[in-house]
Structures are given as C-alpha cells and as structure tokens.
From Swiss-Prot:
A zinc finger (C3H1-type) spans 37-65. PROSITE patterns: ZF_C3H1 (PS50103). InterPro entries: Znf_CCCH, Znf_CCCH_sf. SUPFAM superfamilies: CCCH zinc finger. GO terms for molecular function: zinc ion binding. Keywords: Metal-binding, Zinc, Zinc-finger. This is Uncharacterized protein L412. It comes from the Viruses.
Length: 284
C-alpha cells in the first residue's frame, strides 16, 4: 500500500497528434507517492556512468552521501566503529550466562544470533561495490561496500587470528554519515586495530561466536541438570501415603547415596508398567 502526500508540484507532459498536428497537454499531479525505499539504493544510471533522466526527482540515490542507510544496517556499522561495540559485548556475555538486566532485557538470544550473522556478512567485500557496479552501497547485502568496515572472519568466529596487527584507517566521511540523524552519537576509536582481513573486534571484548555458542549450550545443560535433583525419600513417601492398604509398588530408599539419579531412572518411576497388580488384586 502506498502513502501519499498532497504537497506535490509535479507535472506530467503528454504529446498528442491530431490530424497531423502535434500538441502538448500539461497535467498537474496533486499527489505523489512516498516510497519507503526512497534513496536507499544507488541509481543504476549513475553507476553505469549515464545521465539520470529523473534528475533530483529520482527515487534512487545519486551518491553514497545522499543514500539513506537502513536502520538495522546502520546499527551493525556502529557496532564495528563504536569504542564499546554499542554495548553488544556486555549484552552477549550476560545473556549466555543467563543474566537479565535493564540493558539487555529486550535482547533475546535470537536477536543476538541475528547480530552475529549480520556481522559475519561483513567479513567479506562485495566485489561489485569495489568496482562501483553495485546499487547496494551502504545497504549492500552481498558483503561490505568499503574495506575499512570489513571484519576479520577468523577473529569473529574463534578469536584466534594469528595475522600481524595493523591500524585500520576509517574515512571520517563514513563516521559522520553513521552519526547523522542519531539521538546519540557513538564514540569512535582513536585507532582501529585488526589485520589484513579486517577489524579484530575481540580486542574490544566481543565474545567470539563459537565461544558464545559453546557457553550458551553449557548454560542450558547446567539449567537442565539443576532440575534433575529429586528427593527420593519424599517421592517414596508420596507413593506410599497415596496407596495405603493396597499392594501398589512402594519405593523405599535404604541408601544414603545423595547423588542425582540418571534420566532413565527418573523416567522409569513414572511408567505405568512399573505398577503391577497380581491377579488376586483384581478379583472381586
């Protein structure tokens, strides 16, 4: 569905031919469409070195400076350039430990996984962007459009990159662009460190993705094990008290062993076939 605005001064000219005579009629357009994706892609004509027939009225951007960056894309870029990774390192760390606070209560595991995947997408450069043949620009979905924003894949995944560290120069135009139209500016680093493959975000305390996944799985296992400790004595008394006077099997714990039972043992307590009745019990 399109949104419309009434402040349009646009006109359309149509040429007609009647009995060999040509004439032009001008029609005023009172409404124009507001495109939700306006200026988010680079104009194809400009990329191909051609003149755009729409000029300033083109719905596509004619330069990177004119391009509008998608909000989710801008957030990922700001993570890369912010001194504190926009707080993402502390959020991912507290979430994998199961800690919830004001800063991360709205950041689910699914959202954190999504951010890691978007960061991973910026570990390679879009070849068409480097040759100025891609319409994506800042919003490119095939990789990063500028090498100064590229992330080292090995560092992001494992934190074990052995390449020599170098300083990465980020153009101030990019920094200013990512800070524009924001209520809160991010704090850029005095110098960005990485290797020939891109930024090393672990130097700013991001948790490597594989480590994050491993710790999250261990946290889930710990939570699962914590509910497996069942008071066997109380469980036995419950069965006995509910079946006084019957021959129903009643568990009695004669051991001082306080270790947790296995999953198979716990499951066996709740199987119907464990409670057997003799033929005499069913005789009226």
């Amino acid at each position: 569905m399109h949104n419309y605005t009434s402040d349009s001064d646009e006109e359309i000219k149509l040429e007609f031919t009647d009995n060999g005579k040509s004439y032009t009629k001008v029609y005023h357009i009172p409404y124009r469409t507001n495109h939700s994706n306006e200026k988010k892609l680079i104009c194809f004509s400009i990329i191909n070195g051609e003149n755009c027939i729409y000029g300033p009225n083109c719905t596509y951007a004619h330069s990177l400076s004119e391009q509008i960056i998608e909000e989710d894309k801008k957030f990922i870029y700001r993570i890369i350039l912010d001194e504190n990774l926009m707080g993402f390192s502390s959020i991912s760390e507290s979430n994998e430990k199961g800690c919830i606070n004001e800063s991360n209560k709205n950041m689910s595991d699914r959202k954190i996984e999504e951010i890691y995947k978007k960061l991973l997408n910026l570990t390679h450069i879009c070849e068409k962007c480097t040759s100025n043949k891609c319409t994506g620009g800042y919003n490119c979905r095939n990789g990063v459009f500028d090498s100064s924003l590229k992330i080292c894949k090995n560092d992001l995944l494992t934190g074990e990159c052995l390449n020599k560290l170098v300083n990465i120069k980020v153009d101030e135009i990019i920094v200013d662009k990512l800070n524009s139209n924001q209520t809160e500016s991010f704090k850029s680093c005095q110098s960005y460190q990485g290797c020939i493959n891109g930024h090393h975000l672990t130097l700013r305390n991001i948790i490597p993705y594989y480590k994050y996944v491993h710790q999250k799985e261990n946290s889930r296992k710990y939570q699962y094990q914590s509910v497996r400790y069942i008071d066997i004595d109380q469980l036995g008394k419950l069965f006995c008290n509910n079946n006084v006077g019957s021959n129903t099997y009643c568990y009695q714990n004669e051991s001082d062993d306080t270790e947790s039972s296995t999953d198979e043992e716990i499951s066996s307590w709740f199987r119907k076939d464990e409670f057997e009745f003799s033929d005499s019990d069913n005789t009226v």
